[in-house]
């Protein structure tokens, strides 16, 4: 009987872009961060991404890419217009960042990182999705 063999993994580097001014290709993803985020906001983003994927729009291929895009937009001047809902349940979310975004994330005030990240996600969601 013949042993099953695995074919080598294909390295596919397709350019991924975001809408508007924020055309970014996230390569060299290095570090991982975790924070507690509003579950209702995450569910809204997931549902919107799923409906866009069903319509054939893969501008944001997954949730992590959307998070990186939101942080990148905030780094380049996205105004934080989203107000946090402090009474909503929270869920631990983790995703990876590029070295440049990780440096920017670490430069944020330690006590305000979660708030800034959540507000950046909400602002980016309502402005670009």
Task: Describe the role of every protein-language-model region.
Residues 91-93:
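C-terminal extensions
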Residues 1-89, 98-129:
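A detector of short terminal or domain-flanking linear segments
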């Amino acid at each position: 009987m013949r042993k099953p063999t695995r074919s080598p993994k294909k390295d596919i580097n397709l350019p991924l872009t975001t809408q508007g001014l924020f055309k970014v290709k996230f390569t060299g993803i290095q570090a991982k961060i975790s924070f507690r985020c509003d579950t209702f906001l995450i569910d809204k983003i997931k549902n919107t991404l799923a409906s866009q994927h069903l319509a054939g729009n893969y501008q944001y291929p997954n949730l992590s890419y959307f998070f990186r895009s939101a942080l990148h937009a905030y780094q380049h001047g996205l105004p934080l217009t989203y107000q946090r809902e402090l009474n909503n349940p929270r869920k631990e979310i983790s995703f990876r960042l590029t070295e440049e975004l990780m440096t920017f994330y670490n430069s944020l005030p330690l006590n305000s990182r979660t708030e800034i990240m959540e507000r950046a996600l909400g602002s980016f969601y309502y402005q670009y999705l």
